[in-house]
Amino acid sequence: CSSDLCVTNARKILEENNIEVITFHMTGSGGKSMESLIRQGFINASLDVTTTELADEIVGGTLSAGPTRLTAARDKKIPQVVSLGALDMVNFGPKETVPEKFKNRNLYVHNENVTLMRTTKEECEKIALDICNKLNQSTSKVALMIPLKGVSAIAIKGQVFYDEKADEALFSTIRKNIKPNIELIELDYAINDEEFSNALALKLLSYLN
């Protein structure tokens, strides 16, 4: 229910252009593995579609990749295209394991082992600041691409996590705080729209050519 379709489509375009692609599932361990391989020099460009682990780190979910998530590509000075995939959600296990302080929040039971919680306006502001603080220190080519119509499959209009105010807090905090050395691109699509995934892949290809 997050941004899988976007990743699949972008991967297809990159592979059609003879780019060897490794995909990571952003489950905490996935983000850690990706950052580690970038630091070891095995990866020479990053398309960071699903930054959802930042929400878990900042809000207190179960799938955090730690405070250094979104720093390896910057530190290794490789080109990166970043988006806001699944920043509408914080992950927990079965519903009964959700911390008491979150019991009255907008919760979505994805399956018996996964409960998702919608990020609030205030949480989205904190997440946006974290992204800006990390990316603003970059000296290589970086694009931050915003899908204005929804950051996950369930954050689009008519779906359970649609929240215009929370999304606007995320987007406007980025607009206010991102430095001009970062290419900020806003597109009037949802993250899983083909036009958005195409734009992500083409932007990364432009950095590689």
Regions found by a protein language model. Give the residues of each.
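C-terminal non-catalytic interaction/assembly regions of soluble proteins
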Residues: S64-T68, A72-P79, L84-N209
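Short helix-loop-beta junction
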Residues: A10-E20, I174-N181
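A conserved active-site cap/scaffold subdomain adjacent to cofactor or substrate pockets
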Residues: E20-F24, S29-V82
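A short alpha-helix capping/helix-coil boundary motif
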Residues: K12-E15, L47-T50, N111, V151-I154
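Short acidic, glycine/serine/threonine-rich loops at helix termini
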Residues: L5-R11, S33-L37, E57-G60, F92-E96, ...
